[in-house]
């Protein structure tokens, strides 16, 4: 089939790759001049299936209220006049119950674990390189109450068969030796040994080249205006370079997905939650991380990417903004300097991206009420973690193949 994919972030490119592997003629359209130049550009770099947890969780409303008054808060709420923002926040609050948390986390872990397996297989098949490491993720707790409160997460990890280790200070230093100088800064950690790290931008660009070798065509610098309808199905895509037609269409536009499909009567409650990162060259190996360390207090991930340290995190609900406030940079600097001062922060680059978040934190993967329109969006902070599995899953659904994992609860129908 002829298939057009809208969006060349990591989700769009992985979808294109898997569709091409199944023999389809694929075209990818994006307004940028190359792949992964928006939200996929400089994320935290972690592939962490076990840490696939909903932002909407029991106790979060109270925590959020406290965070609003903290200088280095992991959550920043900047209210706008947009009613969509208020509606999304209310939907998120409705998911902050024990029952919804368990349902949403199980869905997320299912996709994330499958995706990690798909990534490993893809790596074996292609030999793709992207500063990859397979040395686990360490969630670091600065306070005892944080360590004492991981019971629910451990219960879900056990249920889903995800290996984990609860570590004391010495155990944390054993897996991340650079923490030896900061033993007074934390009390323990939770380690998931099967997690990975890697540069999402490098991966997406390398996979795009592999996909081109499979026949995928990329059209960059093309603005997407609207989806056209005829006879109850999508008949084309109106772009800045004319109308593009295909047999099937995939919308993988992250936070911009709702605006495109709204005219079709489809509701995708995806809202941009802004994240920040800095990337610094390593100047002292003895003070640099081995893999990814999650600073639980600040909700910040510190990741080793080759000869660089990537520090990413925070969640700012402020709409479609692209500013880079010095206060956000200060929080990133504080966390990494406290734990891993092996990077040259004076030479660091500062970046922000708009994570496409659903109120239940679960991505939208699947078809719509229009037979030839599909969506792969809303992965939030886990686009890199879930990319390969999401792309392969949707490729199977479009092709009419039996999916490897359950997919009936991942579609847009749960909102419409």
Swiss-Prot record:
Q: Which cofactor does it need?
A: FAD
- Give the UniProt keywords, A-Z: FAD, Flavoprotein, Oxidoreductase
Q: Which GO terms describe its molecular function?
A: D-amino-acid dehydrogenase activity
> Which Enzyme Commission number(s) are listed?
1.4.99.-
This protein's record includes keyword Electron transport:
no
* Reaction equation(s) it catalyzes: a D-alpha-amino acid + A + H2O = a 2-oxocarboxylate + AH2 + NH4(+)
Q: In which pathway does it act?
A: Amino-acid degradation; D-alanine degradation; NH(3) and pyruvate from D-alanine: step 1/1
Recorded GO cellular component terms are: cytoplasm; plasma membrane
Annotated residues that bind FAD are located at 3-17
| Top-tier EC class | oxidoreductase
Q: Which GO terms describe its biological process?
A: D-alanine catabolic process
Q: Which NCBIfam families match?
A: PRK00711.1 (NF001933)
| Free-text function comment from the UniProt entry | Oxidative deamination of D-amino acids.
Q: What is this protein called?
A: D-amino acid dehydrogenase
Natural source organism: Brucella abortus (strain 2308)
Gene symbol here is dadA
């Amino acid at each position: 089939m002829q298939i057009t994919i809208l969006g060349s972030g990591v989700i769009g490119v992985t979808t294109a790759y898997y569709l091409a592997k199944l023999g389809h003629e694929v075209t990818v359209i994006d307004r940028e001049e190359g792949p992964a130049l928006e939200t996929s550009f400089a994320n935290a770099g972690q592939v962490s299936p076990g840490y696939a947890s909903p932002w909407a969780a029991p106790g979060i409303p109270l925590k959020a209220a406290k965070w609003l008054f903290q200088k280095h808060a992991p959550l920043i709420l900047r209210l706008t006049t947009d009613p969509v923002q208020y509606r999304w926040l209310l939907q998120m609050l409705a998911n902050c119950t024990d029952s919804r948390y368990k349902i949403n986390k199980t869905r997320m872990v299912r996709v994330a674990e499958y995706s990690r397996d798909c990534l490993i297989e893809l790596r074996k098949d292609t030999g793709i390189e992207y500063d990859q490491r397979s040395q686990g993720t360490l969630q670091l707790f600065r306070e005892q109450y944080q360590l004492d409160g991981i019971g629910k997460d451990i219960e879900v990890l056990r249920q889903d068969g995800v290996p984990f280790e609860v570590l004391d200070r010495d155990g944390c230093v054993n897996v991340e030796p650079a923490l030896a100088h900061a033993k007074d800064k934390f009390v323990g950690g939770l380690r998931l040994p099967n997690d990975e790290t890697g540069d999402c931008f490098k991966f997406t660009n390398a996979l795009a080249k592999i996909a081109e070798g499979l026949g995928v065509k990329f059209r960059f610098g093309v603005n997407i205006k609207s989806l056209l309808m005829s006879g109850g199905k999508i008949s084309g895509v109106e772009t800045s370079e004319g109308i593009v037609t295909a047999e099937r269409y995939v919308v993988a536009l992250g936070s911009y997905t709702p605006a495109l499909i709204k005219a079709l009567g489809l509701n995708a409650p995806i809202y941009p939650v802004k994240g920040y990162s800095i990337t610094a060259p390593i100047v002292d190996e003895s003070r640099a991380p081995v893999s990814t360390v999650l600073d639980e207090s600040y909700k910040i991930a510190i990741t080793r990417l080759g000869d660089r340290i990537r520090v990413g995190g925070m969640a700012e609900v402020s709409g479609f903004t692209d500013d880079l406030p010095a206060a956000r940079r200060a929080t990133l600097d504080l966390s990494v300097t406290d734990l891993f001062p092996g990077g040259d922060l004076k030479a660091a680059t500062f970046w922000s991206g708009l994570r496409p978040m659903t109120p239940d934190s679960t991505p939208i993967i699947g078809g719509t009420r229009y037979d030839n329109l599909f969506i792969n969006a809303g992965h939030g902070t886990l686009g890199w973690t879930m990319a390969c599995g999401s792309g392969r899953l949707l490729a199977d659904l479009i092709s009419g193949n039996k999916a490897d994992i359950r997919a009936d609860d991942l579609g847009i129908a749960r909102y419409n």
